[in-house]
Design a protein with these regions (language model features):
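Positively charged
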Residues: 1-149, 175, 179, 186-189, ...
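Core structural elements
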Residues: 154-172
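Amphipathic alpha-helical segments within well-ordered protein domains
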Residues: 167, 178-181
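Small/polar glycine-rich anion-binding or flexible loop at a beta-alpha turn
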Residues: 156-159, 182-186
Length: 211
């Protein structure tokens, strides 16, 4: 963990989270983030993903306290100058402070100690039977919102991969996704998903919005 960078270029993306041990594709087209990826590719291939807060009152939105360090594992430049990358989550971090920079992209000083377990290969004691009700409610919610998910493929993944993939792809709000990202471990995250789903229950089954 001592080898991890304490200062990170960051990609603030609303309603988007990435977890350790998950990989996501990203389409980079804004000039400032093209510059950020160029910088990262020439150094350690690492960037930080973090959500801006919902109450945006200016052009430089305030950031949430927790994000995730990601490593660029695949890179391709398109004919029109966009970057298509794949980013693998490594470890979550806590924001310490923003660093002043002349770059157009933002930089943070971060700390990883709170989430050091993200680097460990410890299998948490959960079974698919623990997820059956959550899985059923999530499937109903995804279908209602028009989300297409390959459920058969998910069932073949490990439990942490399944829970994290569903949390990332879910139609939950920015704040709900942030709450899942900040959950200390998989069991807490599973319970948080269950709590969030309970607020959608009437909307799913009775066509009555309770939010």
């Amino acid at each position: 963990m001592n080898n991890l960078p304490k200062e990170l270029p960051i990609f603030p993306l609303s309603n988007f989270i990435i977890f350790p041990k998950t990989t996501v594709p990203l389409n980079i087209f804004e000039p400032r983030y093209i510059d950020m990826i160029n910088y990262s590719m020439k150094s350690n291939k690492l960037i930080g993903m973090i959500q801006p807060k919902s109450s945006i009152s200016n052009t430089v939105p305030e950031l949430h306290e927790v994000g995730c360090l990601g490593k660029i594992t695949s890179f391709r430049e398109t004919e029109d100058g966009r970057f298509l990358i794949e980013l693998k989550g490594l470890i979550r971090f806590v924001k310490i402070k923003e660093i002043k920079t002349e770059n157009k992209y933002r930089m943070l000083e971060v700390d990883y100690k709170k989430f050091s377990q993200d680097l460990e290969n410890v299998k948490e004691d959960l079974k698919f039977t623990d997820l059956e009700l959550i899985f059923k409610d999530l499937k109903s919610l995804f279908e209602k919102k028009g989300f297409v998910i390959n459920w058969k493929a998910l069932e073949k993944q490990s439990l942490d991969e399944t829970i994290n993939a569903l949390a990332m792809a879910s139609p939950f709000s920015l704040e709900e996704k942030q709450m899942l990202l900040e959950s200390k471990n998989l069991d807490i995250r599973k319970n948080k998903i269950s709590q969030i789903l309970s607020t959608y229950t009437y909307d799913i089954y009775d066509n009555t919005t309770v939010q």
